[in-house]
Amino acid sequence: MHICILSGSTLGGAEYVAEHLNDVLETQGFSTALFHGPSLADIKNEKIWLVVTSTHGAGELPDNLKPLFDELAKNQSDFSDVRFAVVGLGNSDYDTFCYAADKVEQVLQEKSAVKICETLKIDVLNVDDQEGYAEAWLPNFIEGLK
């Protein structure tokens, strides 16, 4: 089974989590492709998306992921053959905590993509080991693939 991991990061935290999940999935026998800021053309044939994103500014997607989701929002295609899950990193001191993860989920569901498990929201204020926290959530994602 092939998994496309998309990371959107401003300061590197989401990128580190995405890379860690990529390594764990490969160790477990999955085929993966890791993209830091892909275009829609890069991933148009991918059917399983694991999106790992931080929230930037006032609840925005990071600059390296925003163009993809802007393009998706405007695209008229049906993405019902795409299954996805989202990992969001944010700071609960802000009222826009993990808004980027919510936006990703909203755009994908509007395009009929199928959410396979609950979104993981990591509060960087309270979770020191974000990679380990995401790894502990990973069985939920894998179960959703079945």
Region spans (language model):
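A short beta-strand-loop structural module common to alpha/beta enzyme folds
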Residues: G29-S39
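Extreme N-terminal starter segment of soluble prokaryotic enzymes
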Residues: M1-C4
